[in-house]
């Protein structure tokens, strides 16, 4: 499991807040933004629409801690909200949240299902019934993994992988469902996938 690559987004301080000025800013190819957080004052920013949209489409901004370069001053931040134009499908505004380097944060991490070729159940024609595609974890910004692996080795038809079976990277722990050993995925028979998943999710 590799840690996330740190993406840098360039931003400039913004002193305009009125609607007309914001509209003019967008026409020039920019996006208004704000960054906020506990212990910090709100800071109004301007982003390059081309640069930010490119990173968004590459999938580098969702559930990632990024480096905000604010007129030469670098800060850690999370993208918390993106507002879209209802007709043009262009980004209208971005909210960031400051992240302190030494703090522990909550973040959703995607699950990656590995070793399907080592699952006898899948070799026999079983299908994956994925019940959970991401989990919320706690970790410091420098420990955020790109994904968390779910090992399917040895799994037969009718068997499940529960959250207790998933090995978390060092420095990463569950943020939610800490007392609930919920089902992540089952190997279901191709002709009875629904029935198999219902049985497995009720098992303790």
UniProtKB/Swiss-Prot annotation:
It comes from the Bacteria. Pfam families: Ribosomal_L25p, Ribosomal_TL5_C. The keyword Calcium does not apply. GO terms for molecular function: 5S rRNA binding; structural constituent of ribosome. Transmembrane segments: none annotated. One of its GO terms (cellular component) is cytosolic large ribosomal subunit. Keywords: Ribonucleoprotein, Ribosomal protein, RNA-binding, rRNA-binding. HAMAP family: Ribosomal_bL25_CTC. Belongs to the bacterial ribosomal protein bL25 family. CTC subfamily. Part of the 50S ribosomal subunit; part of the 5S rRNA/L5/L18/L25 subcomplex. Contacts the 5S rRNA. Binds to the 5S rRNA independently of L5 and L18. This is Large ribosomal subunit protein bL25. It comes from Wolbachia sp. subsp. Brugia malayi (strain TRS). The lineage of its organism: Bacteria, Pseudomonadati, Pseudomonadota, Alphaproteobacteria, Rickettsiales. The gene is rplY.
